[in-house]
């Protein structure tokens, strides 16, 4: 099993100048052996709209730094760790530009980028309104996501022909394939709805699933993905399964035994990588680096 790291990108980062903070965290994570470094991709959110943000009485919104710019900055200061958004809602940027951005990150990082995408969560409606972005219904967003995935695969093929979708049209998908990974940067899809699970089975190289939900719910979702894979005649084992663990793992100078038990249970469900949040205090980070990573790397993943 692997350990990934999520770092925050909000205006609550106050310890030091942003660039210095990112360099320090990224270089530490790269040396420590974290498998992947992921960042959230939002522009601004009201903390009351989602349980994933801490409430701050001084700021009515959590303003985010632009995710792909941050990843490019981090790529220049790291050598090994994989890089991704977790994830980019396809309604936030024009899709062909998003694919080219991921291609460029893959080239800059010498083959360490994912194209991390999702259908844009419901709690992002207010964020879209503030940025002047349309926010279609949930069903349309999922349909748009599938079209974006089809577009990405055609762009990566280098085939010179138009892309004619219901929502997006390109005159030609010819272009120099700048990316390093072959056949293309891996697709990471995050979500949990039934329509999203079908897209995961059909298009994803990696999935992020769970988001703080219980083990029983996660087991059910994974079985649905497995069923879709069987229907598509695609090996379920081709897909890397990841989840974001929201709770603190370090407690009073020790790893929380309950957290470790939960991570072991994730591995029994077939989760290949658990993403943890970057802790605020250096001692907790050191504990993750020196104790959590080697412990988790020795946990076998069911089905592997």
Segments from the language model and where they lie:
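Active-site-adjacent structural elements that line small-molecule/cofactor binding pockets in enzymes
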Residues: 1-304
């Amino acid at each position: 099993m692997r350990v990934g790291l999520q770092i925050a990108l909000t205006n609550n980062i106050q310890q030091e100048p942003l660039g210095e903070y990112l360099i320090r965290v990224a270089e530490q994570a790269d040396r420590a052996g974290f498998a992947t470094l992921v960042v959230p991709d939002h522009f601004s959110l009201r903390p009351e709209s989602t349980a994933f943000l801490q409430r701050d009485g001084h700021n009515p919104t959590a303003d985010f730094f632009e995710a792909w710019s941050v990843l490019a900055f981090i790529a220049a200061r790291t050598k090994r760790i994989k890089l991704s958004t977790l994830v980019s809602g396809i309604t936030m940027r024009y899709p062909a530009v998003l694919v080219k951005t991921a291609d460029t990150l893959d080239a800059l990082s010498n083959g360490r980028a994912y194209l991390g995408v999702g259908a844009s969560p419901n709690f992002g409606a207010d964020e879209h309104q503030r940025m002047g972005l349309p926010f279609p219904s949930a069903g349309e967003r999922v349909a748009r996501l599938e079209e974006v995935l089809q577009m990405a695969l055609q762009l990566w093929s280098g085939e010179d022909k138009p892309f004619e979708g219901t929502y997006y049209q390109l005159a030609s998908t010819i272009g120099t394939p700048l990316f390093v990974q072959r056949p293309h940067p891996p697709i990471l899809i995050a979500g949990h709805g039934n329509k999203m699970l079908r897209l995961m089975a059909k298009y994803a190289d990696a999935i992020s699933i769970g988001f703080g939900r219980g083990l029983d719910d996660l087991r059910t979702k994974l079985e649905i993905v497995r069923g879709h894979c069987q229907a598509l005649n695609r090996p379920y084992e081709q897909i890397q399964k990841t989840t974001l663990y929201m709770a603190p793992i370090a407690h009073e100078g020790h790893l929380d035994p309950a957290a470790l038990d939960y991570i072991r249970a994730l591995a029994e469900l077939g989760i290949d990588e658990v993403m943890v949040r970057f802790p605020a205090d250096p001692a907790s980070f050191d504990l993750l680096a020196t104790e959590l990573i080697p412990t988790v790397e020795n946990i076998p993943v069911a089905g592997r």
